[in-house]
Amino acid sequence: MIKKGLRVLLTALFCSLLWVIPVTAGPTGNHYTNGGEGIKAASVPGPGFYYRLYNFFYDTDDLKGVNGESVPANLDVFVYAQAHRLIWVTPIKILGGDWLMDVVVPVVYTDFEAGNGSTRVLDDHFALGDVFIEPLAISWHGDRWDAAIGLMAVAPVGEYDPNRPAMPGKGYWSGIFTAGGTFFPDKAKTWSISYLGRYEIHGNVRNRDVQLGDDYHFEWGIGKALPPEKGIGPLRAFEVGVVGYAQFQINDDSGDDVTWDKNVHDRVYAVGPEVRFVIPQWKTLVELRTNFEFEAKDRTEGIMGNLTITKAF
């Protein structure tokens, strides 16, 4: 048995706050898309203006039930999301750290197929997703560590239709608290271990008495910087590593319009490789990572690819 709303699966939306962005599914509540961060997930650059472009590629044909079993849904879903994030790390200090703010504007394409025969659902759409606004975040830097926290809101301005699974809007507000850190085991900072967690709460779904349960999710990464002289043409400062994420629904869905089992909580884990490098003359960082999901319950299980490009000004 799965949540009824998962028949209208994979409403993809992309957000981003503090090292982020999101793709989500039907009544799976999270706005944030896992997989947008990896190596040095909780490390923020110094004061300045930055443009961060996230490209997400999610592919799945596997819907998992409440016990992790594959549900015969004849599912085939592909999502491409492009999230545009503008970041200002100010010179203003709060609690000894740098105050920063950012906004994330996602656009999402979803190609959705599920079911059989007369019950088969086909839908595809490209549209604006819900917008992430983070007015308050703080980052700190020590000799062998970085840390960051942040508060963000997700505004339901994206196209929303509960009867169309390819629509990117989710139809409700969300609030996200983010906190994490990066530790450098060696003085030269060639090794890094990072963790970035988020707690997400949701408002009522538009025109329905439904409030989805809170979510907790985190991204992590273990990275190794290669020798500086190791480069390919203009590409320098290579780092390689292993990354991953996990997501858990914390409490029950609620409301008189909930028609599925409120006690069912979705979850998923993922792990995969990452490589990143810098193009110094362009002041640009490029990150490529792939996360392979496993042990999913009450949601899809697939592959999340990500290409992120950050430009400093």
Regions flagged by a language model, labelled:
Residues 41, 53, 84-90, 133-138, ...:
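Residues on the lipid-exposed face of transmembrane beta-strands in outer-membrane beta-barrel proteins
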Residues 47, 76-84, 122-132, 169-175, ...:
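Residues that define the transmembrane beta-barrel architecture of outer-membrane proteins
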Residues 26-28, 40-48, 91-100, 140-147, ...:
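Short loop/turn motifs that connect adjacent beta-strands in outer-membrane beta-barrel proteins
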Residues 77-141:
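Long, hydrophobic/aromatic-enriched structural stretches that serve as scaffold segments
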Residues 51-59, 101-107, 149-155, 195-199, ...:
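Transmembrane beta-barrel strands of outer-membrane/channel proteins
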Residues 27-30, 58-81, 116-124, 165:
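Surface-exposed strand-loop-strand hairpins of Gram-negative outer-membrane beta-barrel proteins
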Residues 70, 207-313:
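Outer membrane beta-barrel transmembrane domains
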